């Protein structure tokens, strides 16, 4: 892995899988706090590191988490998808191992929060990607209800489509209870660290 004058990484590898290992290592070097937080948020494991103030978000995240069997899931992807994810996460884990051995520095964010980066499994990549598939779920529910109740003109005022597309009103927009919408919103939210949340205790 060579860095150019702009700090951009250029990977040279003897095989495609080695390139993915190098990319995992480089991603960990550049963004370990970010990807570690993505993993913990996606798997519903924030409270393990940050305390009971994150239990509600963990519960909501686990509602959206893919929990199916991995064999059929891998079989639905390209033939080399599992090997690619294995190689990529091996690269991440190699960087984490370097930190654990004292050979690489622990990113400052972990020091400030008193946490440590976790090891990845290949299936983590698949399980947390389900969150990306529902990221706009709340917006889609709002759009469907607005189309049904007030028509496309009202929805265009809320958020115009780019490019403009005529959207017929759905015959039956989901009439979810507010608790379900709140869970969707919380389960797809980013992670914030207000002091009162970090100081929360179990009731």
Set out the residue ranges of the language-model regions.
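Substrate-recognition/specificity elements adjacent to catalytic centers across diverse enzyme folds
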Residues: 2-203
């Amino acid at each position: 892995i060579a860095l150019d004058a702009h700090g951009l990484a250029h990977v040279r590898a003897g095989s495609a899988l080695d390139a993915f290992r190098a990319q995992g290592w480089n991603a960990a070097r550049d963004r370990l706090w970010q990807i570690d937080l993505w993993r913990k948020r996606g798997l519903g494991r924030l409270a393990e590191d940050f305390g009971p103030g994150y239990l509600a978000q963990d519960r909501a995240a686990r509602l959206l988490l893919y929990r199916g069997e991995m064999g059929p899931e891998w079989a639905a992807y390209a033939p080399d998808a599992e090997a690619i994810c294995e190689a990529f996460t091996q690269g991440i884990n190699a960087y984490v191992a370097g930190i654990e051995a004292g050979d690489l520095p622990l990113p400052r964010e972990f020091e400030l929060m008193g946490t440590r980066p976790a090891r990845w499994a290949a299936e983590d990549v698949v399980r947390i990607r389900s969150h990306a598939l529902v990221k706009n779920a709340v917006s889609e529910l709002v759009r469907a209800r607005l189309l049904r109740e007030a028509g496309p003109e009202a929805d265009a005022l809320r958020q115009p489509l780019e490019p403009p597309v005529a959207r017929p009103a759905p015959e039956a927009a989901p009439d979810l209870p507010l608790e379900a919408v709140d869970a969707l919103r919380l389960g797809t939210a980013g992670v914030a660290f207000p002091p009162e949340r970090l100081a929360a205790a179990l009731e």
